[in-house]
């Protein structure tokens, strides 16, 4: 009985550790609203090269993000997608606040090729350009910190297809 109890406690601790790691990957820096963080991660590609553009995101998160997709469109265009019909989010079936882009957009997908946990400025990325549809989750804007011209804003890039 004791070995089973001990083993199950270890499994529970490992599972909780994995959940904590997974949950930490979806944390935004405190100075951003969810919409601002979406724009930083997925619209504002500060360089045409993934390695340089990802340094901005990695510096906020203090880690090398495994992958990221930049939509080569405007924030306003993505806000317009929030007006498309609601659908269940593919990555989280309990969320019903997703919207399909309806048309393909150019994008660049960045994939970590050289991790560097000790020095995030040494992380290197490969990039893949494409034209794809996307699904975005939208929520009401942060009343205190988001601009009032957009009552509903994108907060999560759920999927590219």
UniProtKB/Swiss-Prot annotation:
Keywords: Chemotaxis, Disulfide bond, Endonuclease, Glycoprotein, Hydrolase, Lyase, Lysosome, Nitration, Nuclease, Signal. It catalyses: an [RNA] containing cytidine + H2O = an [RNA]-3'-cytidine-3'-phosphate + a 5'-hydroxy-ribonucleotide-3'-[RNA]; an [RNA] containing uridine + H2O = an [RNA]-3'-uridine-3'-phosphate + a 5'-hydroxy-ribonucleotide-3'-[RNA]. It comes from Homo sapiens (Human). The gene is RNASE2. Its main location: other. This is Non-secretory ribonuclease. Liver, lung, spleen, leukocytes and body fluids. Its EC number is 4.6.1.18. The N-terminal region is necessary for mediating chemotactic activity. It is an enzyme of class 4 (lyase). The lineage of its organism: Eukaryota, Metazoa, Chordata, Craniata, Vertebrata. Interacts with and forms a tight 1:1 complex with RNH1. Dimerization of two such complexes may occur. GO terms for biological process: chemotaxis; defense response to virus; innate immune response in mucosa; RNA catabolic process. The keyword rRNA processing does not apply. Substrate binds at residues 65-69. Glycans are attached at residues 34, 44, 86, 92, 111, 119. One of its GO terms (cellular component) is extracellular region. The modification 3'-nitrotyrosine is found at residue 60. The keyword Nucleus does not apply. InterPro entries: RNaseA, RNaseA-like_dom_sf, RNaseA_AS, RNaseA_domain. Residues 1-27 form the signal peptide. The active site is at 42 (proton acceptor), 156 (proton donor). It comes from the Eukaryota. Belongs to the pancreatic ribonuclease family.
